[in-house]
């Protein structure tokens, strides 16, 4: 064993001391042959050895304690060194290595904490943007869904024939307001058309009743004329008087025929008005179809806006994923810091290990909070995306209802075309009645001429009376034909027109159709 190896080992030096003390005891015992002296010499040697060893050990421990205390106080730049080359020197070298490692780890942790704080700041900003986007999306989704539901309810009622329905256009969304205004304008024009057709139908009914009543009176007068002719035939002596009476009756018939002709002319004018109303209704329905096409285009624009919002939600989702990845990396860094703290504590530096562990726990806590915030952002984005899809579905449902409304308007246009055909038939019937009335007037005139001839030629009284009777019967048949035609006209064309108009519910007060009426508000004038 060399002197150098003894200096590098505290145990070796202590062993050499004990050997020297034992040698001293042996020497004293051999020389003095006295046990007491030997014991005293042994105790003195041990005390001397212990004092020297204790002094060196205490000095080394004091020196290391002072240096490690400065490290514990945060001075990681101090260099730990010792003049000893034994285990205490090795301990000083180990503490120096721990100091350097701790300083490097703390530098890394400071950098990691700075990165984590920046990530936390970015996460807070992203969360604020996500919350603002969520609020905006919720408001937009709720507003569009409510408006679409209200529009759908009103359009469904209108499709069932209730033309008094209007939508509330008081909304901050231009696209939906345009849809509502177009629908209300279409319903106003369609209701005005139906009201016009209804009014004309009522006038036709009233005037047809008047013509029918006039025909009945004419028929009664014709029957009276027939009886008069019979009296002429049976009472030849009163022939002249009866003929004069018949002439008067014929004049009444002629006047009635002229009245019928005038009424038929007026009815023809009314029929022309109905034709014009039907044409206006057809034009209004075609305009309504154009408006419905515009409504479909506006609804498509609304769907495009919602799809753009979905794309923004996808971008925010990508940002949240990046934040989650940063949080996971920070969490791994915190785990490494915890391992280093445990390692530092295992090497005997409890205070250093605890301080290192506190920093690691703080980093881990920040990482977990960042991960939690990122998860919340992802949850919010998922909810906003779901609501956006619901808005898209609602708008698409509105498009479907608009298509249904378009089909309804097309059906109404077909019905109006049918009404126009019925009006054409009415006009044809009126023309036939006009021709029949003209024939009746000619017949009455011929009858008057016949009565004049009978008056001038009494000898031909019987023959003329027979001709008169024949002419009057023919006239009665004509009047009956007119009456039957009017009844048929009333039962078929007019009633069919009224039944078709009654399919629609309209507001009798034409000023009540305002675009600012509440959705589904009841009609002011009641239903027809």
Swiss-Prot record:
Its main location: membrane. It is a multi-pass membrane protein. Residues 214-455 form the Methyl-accepting transducer domain. The keyword RNA-binding does not apply. Keywords: Cell membrane, Membrane, Methylation, Repeat, Transducer, Transmembrane, Transmembrane helix. The chain crosses the membrane at residues 11-31, 35-55. One of its GO terms (molecular function) is transmembrane signaling receptor activity. Residues 55-107, 142-195 form the HAMP domain. It is found in: Cell membrane. Gene3D superfamilies: 6.10.340.10, Methyl-accepting chemotaxis protein. One of its GO terms (biological process) is chemotaxis. The keyword Membrane applies. It holds the Pfam family MCPsignal. Induction: Expressed constitutively throughout the growth phases, both in presence and absence of white light. The modification Glutamate methyl ester (Glu) is found at residue 259. GO terms for cellular component: plasma membrane. Belongs to the methyl-accepting chemotaxis (MCP) protein family. Transduces signals from the phototaxis receptor sensory rhodopsin I (Sop1). Interacts with Sop1. This is Sensory rhodopsin I transducer. It comes from Haloarcula marismortui (strain ATCC 43049 / DSM 3752 / JCM 8966 / VKM B-1809). The gene is htr1.
């Amino acid at each position: 064993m060399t002197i150098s190896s003894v200096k590098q080992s505290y145990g070796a030096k202590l062993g050499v001391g004990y050997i020297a003390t034992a040698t001293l005891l042996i020497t004293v015992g051999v020389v003095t042959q006295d046990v007491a002296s030997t014991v005293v010499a042994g105790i003195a040697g041990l005390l001397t050895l212990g004092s020297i060893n204790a002094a060196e050990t205490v000095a080394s421990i004091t020196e290391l304690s002072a240096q490690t205390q400065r490290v514990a106080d945060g001075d990681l730049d101090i260099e730990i060194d010792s003049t000893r080359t034994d285990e205490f020197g090795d301990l000083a070298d180990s503490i120096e290595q721990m100091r350097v490692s701790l300083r490097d780890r703390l530098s890394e942790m400071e950098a990691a904490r700075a990165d984590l704080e920046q990530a936390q700041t970015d996460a807070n900003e992203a969360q604020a943007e996500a919350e603002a986007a969520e609020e905006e999306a919720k408001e937009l989704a709720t507003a569009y869904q409510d408006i679409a539901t209200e529009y759908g309810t009103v359009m469904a009622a209108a499709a069932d024939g209730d033309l008094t329905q209007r939508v509330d256009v008081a909304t901050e969304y231009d696209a939906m307001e345009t849809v509502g205004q177009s629908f209300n304008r279409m319903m106003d024009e369609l209701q005005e058309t139906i009201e016009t057709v209804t009014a004309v139908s009522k006038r036709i009914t009233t005037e047809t009743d008047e013509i029918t009543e006039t025909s009945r009176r004419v028929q009664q007068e014709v029957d009276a004329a027939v009886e008069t002719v019979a009296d002429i035939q049976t009472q030849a002596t009163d022939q002249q008087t009866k003929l004069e009476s018949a002439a008067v009756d014929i004049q009444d018939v002629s006047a009635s025929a002229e009245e019928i002709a005038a009424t038929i002319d007026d009815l023809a004018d009314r029929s022309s008005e109905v034709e014009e109303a039907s044409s206006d209704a057809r034009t209004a329905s075609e305009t309504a179809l154009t408006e419905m096409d515009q409504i479909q285009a506006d609804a498509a624009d609304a769907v495009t806006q919602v799809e753009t919002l979905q794309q923004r939600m996808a971008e925010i989702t990508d940002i949240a994923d990046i934040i989650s990845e940063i949080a996971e990396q920070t969490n791994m860094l915190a785990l490494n810091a915890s391992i280093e703290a445990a390692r530092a504590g295992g090497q005997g530096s409890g205070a250093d290990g605890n301080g290192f562990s506190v920093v690691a726990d703080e980093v881990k806590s920040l990482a977990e909070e960042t991960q939690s915030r990122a998860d919340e952002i992802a949850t919010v984005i998922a909810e906003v995306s779901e609501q956006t899809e619901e808005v898209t579905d609602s708008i698409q449902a509105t498009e479907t209802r608009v298509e249904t409304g378009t089909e309804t308007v097309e059906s109404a246009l077909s019905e109006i075309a049918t009404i126009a055909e019925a009006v054409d038939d009415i006009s044809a019937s009126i023309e036939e009645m006009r021709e029949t009335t003209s024939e009746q007037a000619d017949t009455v005139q011929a009858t008057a001429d016949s009565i004049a001839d009978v008056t001038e030629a009494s000898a031909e009284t019987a023959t003329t009376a027979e001709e008169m009777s024949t002419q009057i019967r023919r006239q009665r048949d004509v009047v009956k034909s007119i009456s039957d035609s009017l009844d048929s006209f009333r039962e078929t064309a007019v009633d069919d027109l009224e039944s078709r108009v009654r399919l629609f519910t309209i507001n009798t007060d034409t000023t009540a159709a305002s675009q600012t009426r509440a959705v589904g508000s009841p009609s002011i004038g009641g239903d027809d």
